Amino acid sequence: MASIPSTGSLIATHDYYRRRIGSTSSNSSCGSSEYAGEVIPHPPGLQRQDSGHWWSSFFFPNKQNQPGGMIGSEQKSGTYTVTNGQVACIAREMVLKKQLSRQLSESSDSGKVEQGSPPPS
């Protein structure tokens, strides 16, 4: 008995329920002029995604391939903004991690004694 891969089913389900609001792209995965302005209702059991682009999951692996789904503390901390009816993720975590690593490297560099200068007394 043949089975349907779950990934294909999720992609097909997502494509069916995706909102298509005035896309001007010629790429068939981004909507078409035939469906311009059509709003397909979102089923309550599925999480919303931000853009519906197949490649977005490569940039948001920590969100379980659901970059538009607001999860836990991210929902409270305001890391998402709404523009043109689509949810876009702000990479706040990446910025905070970069700032933290920069602070740690600066503090470790300031603790080193340079050659030629006397140690502090």
Curated annotation (Swiss-Prot):
One of its GO terms (biological process) is cell differentiation. Keywords: Developmental protein, Differentiation. Signal peptide: none annotated. Residues 101-110 have a biased composition (Polar residues). Pfam families: PPDFL (PF15060). Residues 23-33 have a biased composition (Low complexity). Residues 22-47, 101-121 are annotated as: Disordered. PANTHER family: PANCREATIC PROGENITOR CELL DIFFERENTIATION AND PROLIFERATION FACTOR. Belongs to the PPDPF family. Probable regulator of exocrine pancreas development. This is Pancreatic progenitor cell differentiation and proliferation factor. It comes from Salmo salar. The gene is ppdpf.
